Amino acid sequence: MSTNAIARRYAKALVQIGAEEGQVDKFNSELTQFNTVLAANAGLTSVFSNPAYGIEAKREILKEIIGKLALSESVAKFLQLLLDRSRLAFLPQITESYGNFADDLSGVVRPTLTSGLPLEESQIEEIKTSLTKTTGKKVMLKVQVDPSLIGGVVTKIGDKVFDGSVKTQLAKIQDILQKG
């Protein structure tokens, strides 16, 4: 089974529990918080992945971290399950998948808008409004500037890319000219 499939399975299970308890956003925050602590501490990550440390020692370390972060009982049990099943290494992918499932559940989409030049706030709002109408969801737009685009914009929503950049248009023209 692929890493993404495993991560999605665990994330979906936790989202379902979160939905039942009305705690989807809280679980997302706690999972992200724990993932950030783990990512920031390479020594901690190596302890959890090192077979030289026994499962009991790993459980004690995990309990201590859970206590310091004051995580909810459901997230604590979830993290203990990941540890017991040797799936803690998948936590970054699980956290990302959880965020995606939580967004779907709450009707949120997080597209990325990349432009060749900085956009004015009114332009960004106009694009955001258009995306809201197109997707039918609340839009949390991430705006980036990439001077290599020369001009225009590239919008990425999930795995769909809408490329209206000058760079791409020039590449298409060049391709047509080369083919003669």
UniProtKB/Swiss-Prot annotation:
Cell compartments where the protein resides: Cell inner membrane
Membrane topology, as annotated: Peripheral membrane protein
A GO term, aspect molecular function: proton-transporting ATP synthase activity, rotational mechanism
InterPro entries cross-referenced by the UniProt entry: ATP_synth_OSCP/delta_N_sf, ATPase_OSCP/dsu
Listed SUPFAM superfamilies: N-terminal domain of the delta subunit of the F1F0-ATP synthase
Main location (coarse class): membrane
Keywords (A to Z) from UniProt: ATP synthesis, Cell inner membrane, Cell membrane, CF(1), Hydrogen ion transport, Ion transport, Membrane, Transport
Domain of life: Bacteria
GO cellular component, one term: proton-transporting ATP synthase complex
Protein family per UniProt: Belongs to the ATPase delta chain family.
Subunit structure: F-type ATPases have 2 components, F(1) - the catalytic core - and F(0) - the membrane proton channel. F(1) has five subunits: alpha(3), beta(3), gamma(1), delta(1), epsilon(1). F(0) has three main subunits: a(1), b(2) and c(10-14). The alpha and beta chains form an alternating ring which encloses part of the gamma chain. F(1) is attached to F(0) by a central stalk formed by the gamma and epsilon chains, while a peripheral stalk is formed by the delta and b chains.
Function: F(1)F(0) ATP synthase produces ATP from ADP in the presence of a proton or sodium gradient. F-type ATPases consist of two structural domains, F(1) containing the extramembraneous catalytic core and F(0) containing the membrane proton channel, linked together by a central stalk and a peripheral stalk. During catalysis, ATP synthesis in the catalytic domain of F(1) is coupled via a rotary mechanism of the central stalk subunits to proton translocation. This protein is part of the stalk that links CF(0) to CF(1). It either transmits conformational changes from CF(0) to CF(1) or is implicated in proton conduction.
This protein's name: ATP synthase subunit delta
